[in-house]
Amino acid sequence: MPRSFLVKKVKLDTFSSADLDSSYGRARSDLGVRLQDKGYLSDYVGPASVYDGDAEAALLKGPSPEPMYAAAVRGELGPAASGSAPPPTPRPELATAAGGYINGDAAVSEGYAADAFFITDGRSRRKAANANAAAAPSTASVAAPDSDAGGGGGPGTRGSGSGSASRGGTRVGAGTEARAGSGATGAGGRHACGECGKTYATSSNLSRHKQTHRSLDSQLARRCPTCGKVYVSMPAMAMHLLTHDLRHKCGVCGKAFSRPWLLQGHMRSHTGEKPFGCAHCGKAFADRSNLRAHMQTHSAFKHFQCKRCKKSFALKSYLNKHYESACFKGGASGPATPAPPQLSPVQA
């Protein structure tokens, strides 16, 4: 008998081999840290009866029967979040199917709720606050660029050619591009671009943005030494240069990547691993960015609105798809309903 048959196989202690209660008992401390650090809400926090004697790390093994937006309805997340109506959970039957567990196609190691991406994130609230401030600008914010940008005779002021921005009485030094005449601050102390109107929080971000308005014939444009492609934005050129240094190669298909984490994400296409799962509908994704884009479909914040039918979308790509397929084609056929009488003479 070969010697390999005499070797005793050791059964590893994994979540797949252990019972579910003990597995969640060992992992509850890690889950508790993720709940606190990443801002997860009450979707995974259950009553203390789940683990007897341990009320702090009491976690549910599936979706909570409480509504996903209970914290937002109670107003614990601020007035901006509590003022929006909570959207309905797309698939509530998942909470009761199979004993309360989400049945996905692949094993999901992390589950995310839409609240963790959007309601706890301040970007949506800041965007709404800036929109309100732009609709009704204060006199102080309007007078600030005039006092700094042109013509004043006081000390420390410059002509309109410099256009340096000021915020709160202090001068913010802008780059060479920002001093070209559009460094004035708009509503809320943000730096506005004089060509396209976009606003930025810092003058350095404005200077980086102004590189995109350069012409390809400009002296500041740079050419890639490998392929000869011309770039007017230096950050974009730096990202392009990485595409010529593909040192991380896939051992399965031979595809090469510039960074190791790109190769790691590519390997999931061979293994079928989808570790990022949606806590609302159970759909799993191989990449976190795809999950983040999917989460916007469950969000109450839909900022992209169709100009024709006033239907709103969470993603701009969804709005563009709506323009191409539904709204404008359907709208063109709608007003053209009296067109068949015009076609009848042609057909005759």
From Swiss-Prot:
A zinc finger (C2H2-type) spans 191-213, 222-244, 248-270, 276-298, 304-327. Residues 130-190 are annotated as: Disordered. Disulfide bonds: none annotated. Pfam families: zf-C2H2 (PF00096), zf-C2H2_6 (PF13912). InterPro entries: Snail/Krueppel_Znf, Znf_C2H2_sf, Znf_C2H2_type. One of its GO terms (cellular component) is nucleus. Its main location: nucleus. Residues 1-20 are annotated as: SNAG domain. Residues 130-148, 163-182 have a biased composition (Low complexity). PROSITE patterns: ZINC_FINGER_C2H2_1, ZINC_FINGER_C2H2_2. Residues 149-162 have a biased composition (Gly residues). GO terms for biological process: negative regulation of transcription by RNA polymerase II; regulation of neuron migration. It comes from the Eukaryota. GO terms for molecular function: DNA-binding transcription repressor activity, RNA polymerase II-specific; RNA polymerase II transcription regulatory region sequence-specific DNA binding; zinc ion binding. It is found in: Nucleus. Keywords: DNA-binding, Metal-binding, Nucleus, Repeat, Repressor, Transcription, Transcription regulation, Zinc, Zinc-finger. Transcriptional repressor that binds E-box motif CAGGTG. Appears to function downstream of proneural bHLH proteins in promoting neural differentiation. Interacts (via SNAG domain) with LIMD1 (via LIM domains), WTIP (via LIM domains) and AJUBA (via LIM domains). The N-terminal non zinc-finger region mediates the repressor activity. Belongs to the snail C2H2-type zinc-finger protein family. This is Transcriptional repressor scratch 1.
